[in-house]
Amino acid sequence: MAAIGMFAPVGAFALTGETAGAALSRIDESDVDHVCVNDHVSFRVGAGSDALVNAAAVLTHYRLLPCHVALYLLPLRHPVTVARQLASIAELAPGRLTFGVGLGGDDRHEVEICGADPRTLGRRMDESLQILRALSDGESIDFDGEFFTLHEARIVPAPAPRIPIIVGGRSDAAVRRAGRFGDGWLGIWVSPGRFATVTLRIAEHAQAAGRSPDGFAHALNVWCGFGPTRTAARAPLEAAMRGFYQMPFEPFERYSPYGSPGEVAEFLQPYVEAGCSAVNIIACADRHEDPVAGVAEVRRLLAPQPKAARTHEHVFS
């Protein structure tokens, strides 16, 4: 059974202030399994939001709601400071964060203004993941790499339980990276057949690295449009994707379902059958409340088991 989550209405996905808070409350009150947050420093026109700041805000306000970072531009940050951020979040909300990471090379300028070289993002990511995994045990580490040199680096207390790291990307290098360093893969713009093939290859890469793929969890980010007709559902989806990516919608359309919740669920079912354990929906509709209702209905259709009630108490109360 796949967990069905949706992106929080923050940052570049468009709601602010009281409207965003109300939408997050609707997500928490619904049968949606988890909330997702995205990450950009300065994308295209300068847009963005810090995924770990937003994750901390969500996790401390809603005591039982899990949060998936899907995904975080890890090569644009220093891995030791990220390890501290993750450890701090784990203290506040143990076991409720899933940490997805990716290169974020779609906007070369964003990478450059963060002081990174777009040509070396992959190697930088590999070193960052090695450091994150080593620091997650709470032991002192030394590291001598191309980008990072550490002597007796340590982060305590270590996250307990360990925060799963899901590696995103469509390239062969990303697939190898997921097997070598991740706890699963995060796909986007992929067919169900390709999804199944990639997960098998990740298992092979994990075994080649001396790791067991047992327990790996693979996820899918997917843009979806909801509305009373397919035409009505397509319009807000197309507008949102054009605005975010600054590109035409048509090349993405075959991977981006729209229509009724039933039509969206029918589109997603083959991914669940292909081994997807978490579907992260970027939901678009003409009315703010419609995306939450649409995703909740998709969840009911794909995973009909009811959820336990949640509390709205603040974590510090």
Positions of predicted regions on the chain:
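Active-site-adjacent structural elements that line small-molecule/cofactor binding pockets in enzymes
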Residues: 1-317
